[in-house]
């Protein structure tokens, strides 16, 4: 394996649209959402380790999930787990991890990947990632893997690339925020828009240079502790300084400003597993389009539902269509799939 290959696995999210299974104490990346025997973070780590040395995969997560990471990924050492003492979006944590890697290996090439996505053909993913690494090793570039849209989704940001670019790797024209439905339809009709899946590839030299140019204040904050990285004093420096970083995404902080941004349209099948509905799409279904995770079910006159319970639960349903049925601990959720985006708000209101 190439010792210059590194990965940053983003594992700090809560996944509140998957409540009541995904909670602040035990978020979705640490669950076996697909009923496959592996949690989402385990599947993602395994996928990345086909190309990247295990010791070069860093896990970025919240302090409260440290034990969960070490339990589910026993091959990972504590120094590979980067703990955020405060939630500051994606730019600060990516800069922190990039500087830590740069100190260890100035020639490093790295991928930033979410820990909770579903990818069908892992060999194609590996091929695409290798193609991006090869490009970034030769060019001063910031790359992303774009996902070919299959319908006008209003829940994703979009990447517009140069229509006249006939190369496999395209020049990015601009990043577009989550659109309304009509705008999303126009994006698909244009033919040069991709979903932003949040998978980024670059050399540490290129990303650190971009931070120095576009985020000098944030870069100064984290460079102040450069001598502490990969030493026993790293945690103390991060605890004392991390919360002072601006709360900003990598898209807004860097990618929307830089001119050397490229995209490779991915050839693998992808799903962000962001909602119960998206999980329903990827699970095996019966002849009436019902998907079941763990439960034993008896279904009559019911279709297009997703049912998730513990393995010892018997669920009997009659006359239900397009619903989410989730039984977890002391919560039973029965909710229309068409209103699944409301679940996040329900969780917030329950906390008040």
State where each predicted segment sits.
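Short beta-strand segments
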Residues: 9-11, 60, 111-114, 144-148, ...
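Conserved core of the sugar-phosphate nucleotidyltransferase
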Residues: 122-239, 262, 312, 336-337
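Glycine-rich phosphate-binding "P-loop"
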Residues: 29-35
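Conserved N-terminal catalytic core of the sugar/cofactor nucleotidyltransferase
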Residues: 1-9, 17-24, 35-114, 118-124, ...
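Residue-level signal for inorganic ion chemistry
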Residues: 41, 97, 116, 159, ...
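Left-handed beta-helix
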Residues: 2-4, 204-352
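General beta-strand structural signal in soluble alpha/beta enzymes
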Residues: 59, 83, 112, 143-145, ...
């Amino acid at each position: 394996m190439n010792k210059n290959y590194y990965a940053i696995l983003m594992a700090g999210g809560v996944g509140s649209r998957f409540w009541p299974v995904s909670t602040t104490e035990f978020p979705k990346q640490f669950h076996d959402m697909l009923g496959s025997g592996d949690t989402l973070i385990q599947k993602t780590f395994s996928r990345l380790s086909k190309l990247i040395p295990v010791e070069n995969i860093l896990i970025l997560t919240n302090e409260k999930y440290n034990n969960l990471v070490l339990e589910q990924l026993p091959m990972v050492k504590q120094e590979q787990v980067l703990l955020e003492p405060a939630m500051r979006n994606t730019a600060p944590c990516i800069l922190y991890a990039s500087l830590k890697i740069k100190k260890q290996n100035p020639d490093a090439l790295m991928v930033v990947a979410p820990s909770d996505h579903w990818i069908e053909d892992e060999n194609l993913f590996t091929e695409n990632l290798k193609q991006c690494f090869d490009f970034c090793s030769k060019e001063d570039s910031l790359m992303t893997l774009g996902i070919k849209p299959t319908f006008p989704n209003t829940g994703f940001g979009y990447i517009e690339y140069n229509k006249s670019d006939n190369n496999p790797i395209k020049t990015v024209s601009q990043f577009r925020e989550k659109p309304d439905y009509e705008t999303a339809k126009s994006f698909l009709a244009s033919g040069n828009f991709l979903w932003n899946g949040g998978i980024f590839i670059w050399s540490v030299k290129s990303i650190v240079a971009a931070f120095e140019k576009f985020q000098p204040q944030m870069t100064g904050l984290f460079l102040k502790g450069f001598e502490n990285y990969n030493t026993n004093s790293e945690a103390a420096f991060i605890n004392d300084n991390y919360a002072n970083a601006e709360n900003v995404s990598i898209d807004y902080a860097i990618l929307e400003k830089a001119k050397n941004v490229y995209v490779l349209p991915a050839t693998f099948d992808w799903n962000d597993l962001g909602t119960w509905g998206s999980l329903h799409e990827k699970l095996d279904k019966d002849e009436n389009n019902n998907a079941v995770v763990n439960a034993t079910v008896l279904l009559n006159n019911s279709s297009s539902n997703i049912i998730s319970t513990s393995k010892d639960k018997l669920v009997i349903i009659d006359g239900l269509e397009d619903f989410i049925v989730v039984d977890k601990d002391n919560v039973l959720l029965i909710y229309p799939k068409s209103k699944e985006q409301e679940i996040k708000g329900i969780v917030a209101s329950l906390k008040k």
